[in-house]
Regions:
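Outer-membrane beta-barrel pore domains and translocons
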Residues: 72-76, 123-127, 173-175, 224-229, ...
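Glycine- and aromatic-enriched membrane insertion/assembly motifs of diderm outer-membrane
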Residues: 92-129
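Outer-membrane beta-barrel pore domains
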Residues: 30, 41, 91-94, 130-133, ...
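Transmembrane beta-strands of outer-membrane beta-barrel proteins
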Residues: 67-73, 118-122, 166-170, 221-223, ...
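Residues on the lipid-exposed face of transmembrane beta-strands in outer-membrane beta-barrel proteins
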Residues: 69, 73, 102-111, 153-158, ...
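Surface-exposed coil loops of outer-membrane beta-barrel proteins
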Residues: 80-99, 129-155, 159-250, 256-263, ...
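N-terminal periplasmic/intermembrane-space "pro-region" immediately following the signal or transit peptide
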Residues: 2-85
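Outer-membrane beta-barrel channels and translocator barrels
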Residues: 62, 112-116, 161-164, 175, ...
Length: 409
């Protein structure tokens, strides 16, 4: 993580130096400034924001590349005080209890297709999130002592001149399933913590090829072939197939349904199927509503392997921008793992037919255009004792509090 921090400081210095040679941007081209705020830090951090933005702009123009990133640090507390190890149960990217964690120094570089007919995107994570992403997506050899650097995405893009154009990307890319995402600069999840659906219901990344086609101005379809769920290695010489459709009947409503099907185990016999349906509604400008239903099943994946494993979950998120600085997001969900196939990592073994639920409230405030602060309270429940308490007991609920700072450039 120290190497990642050094890289961040070096990149920051380059951007500031480059900004000294940047001409003043015309007022018409400048972004609209944030409104006044009691907690605004525009007076002291705003000049740094402007220097970095100007330096980035000049470097992008000189190189013909788009690039950026963010720095993310957070702290999470749990009412269960887990010990030995001090991991918060059924969490992943926010599982470290009572620690100030340098989560991420994220960088991306991309090239549009317009110059060469072929574009690319490469992005990487440096820090704790890099370690956890590597563990979660089976790139590492073991689930511990992973390096604090991980290649998140690396793919080429092109467009086949057929009809409206078939967009194709090949390489390592983030999944199309689910509401929540692996965050990108300026595109974060509405909450600090991730949902159970994100952690256990859907994959995170794929290695393969994915195409998309605009059938109609309201209809987009995608289809592709990948090595499987979160596994860059072809562990069974059988590809998995992805497909989906996105419907946009109006500017206010979007519905996306995506699925993946294929063999995920080493012997290649059991097949896994998952479909994720996400409805997005934006009835008024400050308000966004998200509703997700995800269903999955896998052959012979129950505890003991005596029957198929099935899981499903329902979640809803309401996000409201009270001002251009202040946002609140409320998330609620329920997730059922009927056969103990998905809720892995429980403190005292997996449970069949376990149901977990949570309600999360997150407040976000933009101290400047680039500096975002967030606080969160979350309550988890289960019909089983699945949440570790102390060193040797488990409980049916837990409460967590979290704080986060994100600096985007």
């Amino acid at each position: 993580m120290k190497k990642g921090l050094r890289r961040f400081l070096l990149a920051l210095a380059v951007l500031i130096i480059a900004s000294s040679t940047t001409r003043i941007v015309n007022a018409a081209e400048e972004e609209k400034p944030l409104g006044p705020g009691w907690l605004s830090l525009d007076c002291c951090i705003g000049p740094l924001d402007n220097a970095i933005a100007n330096g980035k702009d000049s470097l992008q123009k000189a190189s013909g590349l788009n690039f950026g990133g963010y720095l993310d640090t957070s702290y999470t507390w749990s009412s269960n005080h887990p010990r030995s190890p001090s991991d918060i149960s059924l969490r992943y990217f926010d599982k470290d209890y009572n620690k100030i964690v340098f989560n991420n120094f994220h960088l991306f570089v991309e090239k549009p297709e317009k110059d060469w007919g072929v574009g690319f995107r490469v992005s990487g994570d440096f820090g704790r999130s890099g370690e956890l992403l590597r563990e979660a997506t089976l790139w590492g050899k073991a689930l511990h002592k992973e390096p604090s650097a991980e290649l998140r995405e690396a793919y080429l893009t092109t467009t086949i001149p057929f009809g409206e154009g078939i967009g194709v990307k090949g390489g390592l890319f983030v999944t199309t399933l689910g509401t929540e995402i692996l965050p990108n600069p300026g595109a974060y999840n509405d909450n600090i913590s991730r949902s159970f659906l994100f952690n256990f219901g859907v994959p995170l990344r794929h290695l393969g090829v994915l195409a998309n086609y605009q059938v109609h101005k309201m209809v987009n379809v995608n289809f592709g072939v990948v090595t499987g769920w979160d596994d860059p290695h072809d562990n069974n010489h059988q590809p998995s197939f992805m497909g989906g459709v996105t419907l946009t009947p109006s500017d206010m409503v979007t519905f996306a349904s995506n699925l993946i099907y294929g063999a995920e185990q080493r012997n290649g016999a059991p097949k896994r199927f998952t479909i994720s349906n996400v409805l997005t509604v934006k009835p008024i400008d400050p308000l966004a509503l998200y509703l997700e239903y995800t269903y999955g099943q896998e052959d012979d994946a129950s505890l003991g392997g005596t029957r198929d494993g099935k899981w499903q979950g329902l979640s809803g998120i309401a996000s409201y921008n009270w001002t251009d600085r202040f946002n609140t997001a409320l998330r609620a969900e329920v997730f059922n793992d009927r056969d103990g196939a998905r809720l892995l990592g429980e403190p005292f073994g997996n449970h069949a037919n376990a149901t977990v639920a949570e309600v999360t409230l997150t407040g976000s405030y933009k101290f400047t255009k680039m500096l975002l602060g967030r606080t969160e309270v979350r309550q988890d429940w289960s019909d089983r004792n699945m949440f570790k308490r102390g060193a040797s007991t488990a409980d049916s609920n837990q409460t967590t509090l979290a704080m986060q700072l994100i600096y985007t450039f």
